[in-house]
């Protein structure tokens, strides 16, 4: 009888430990899900619109809480919901903030101007090859975003779908983490 009682006690201990590990796994999964939704998440670059800064397939760490501590700044690389419509609509876009609320943004002679001053853009490799874009004033709470790829037709951005509200921006792209050889802060 003691042998049978020992097996029963062992089985109860094993089941209790299995249950405890299951509870820990559910809690860890829940915390990681919340962390991914509200703090940091991983995004994959799709397309060429941010070349030469970002290339197809690179993985980014997106800081989702950065915008809770302050608005996007000029030059920030952000991930946003695609505001466009149509068959080429994507879930998310990666773009650079070039115009802040109240700014006047235009493309003149294939160069970007913000508030009448030619923007310094060390991250681009060519002048803008798309047609010039008439001056637009960025509304309060909105941002003018562009892709770094200035070759003709290479970026679907605020020149095509207009300014984007802060609510459309889900986070700031903080790092390139893959491929690891390109690990870098943005």
Listing of model-derived features with the role each one plays in the protein:
Residues 58, 73-77, 103, 142, ...:
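Structural motif
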Residues 49-53, 66-71, 96, 102, ...:
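Short, surface-exposed secondary-structure edge patches
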Residues 66-68, 84-86, 105, 112, ...:
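Solvent-exposed loop/turn segments at secondary-structure junctions
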Residues 114-131:
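PP2C/PPM family metal-dependent serine/threonine protein phosphatase catalytic domain
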């Amino acid at each position: 009888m003691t042998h049978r009682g020992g097996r029963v006690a062992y089985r109860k201990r094993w089941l209790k430990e299995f249950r405890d590990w299951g509870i820990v796994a559910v809690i860890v999964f829940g915390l990681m899900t919340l962390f991914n939704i509200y703090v940091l998440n991983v995004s994959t670059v799709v397309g060429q619109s941010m070349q030469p800064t970002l290339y197809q397939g690179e993985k980014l760490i997106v800081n989702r809480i950065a915008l809770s501590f302050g608005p996007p700044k000029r030059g920030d690389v952000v991930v946003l919901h695609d505001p466009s419509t149509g068959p080429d609509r994507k879930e998310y876009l990666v773009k650079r903030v070039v115009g802040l609320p109240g700014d006047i943004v235009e493309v003149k002679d294939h160069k970007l101007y913000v508030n009448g001053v030619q923007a310094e853009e060390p991250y681009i490799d060519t002048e803008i090859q798309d047609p010039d874009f008439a001056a637009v004033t960025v509304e309060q709470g909105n941002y003018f975003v562009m892709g770094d790829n200035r070759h003709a037709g290479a970026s679907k951005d605020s020149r095509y779908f207009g300014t984007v509200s802060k609510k459309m921006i889900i986070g700031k792209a903080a790092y390139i983490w893959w491929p690891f050889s390109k690990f870098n802060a943005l």
